[in-house]
Amino acid sequence: MKKWYKGDTHLHTTNSDGNMTPEKLISECKKIGLDYMIITDHNYNTIKKSRFDGDMLIIQGQELTDEPGHVNVWGAKVPHDPPHKLDTVDDYKKLIDASREAGATISLNHPFCSNCPFLLD
């Protein structure tokens, strides 16, 4: 039997600009019955390793945020230690390539942002 999975792929905690601690956010996601969640704090690896907490999968992630735009990295530790300036699109590309090599899935946030110079090619 096929099943739909409920989850959220873009969550922030008090480690960046969210209003809940990681523990509280995990608890709230479990309360509403999510199957998975990805904490994507800005430029910070809040979840050090993906894991199950009861029946809910907590996936490691991070939102790379700087002048050129915002990119989510899911499922692998971002290979840099903040603070790390990402001043150019080339800086992002290098970090994204390194993240992919580490096994991450990449998601471009806000693709129609007028001041984010990513090219959708």
Please place each PLM-identified region on the residue numbering:
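A metal-dependent hydrolase metal-coordination microenvironment
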Residues: M1-D121
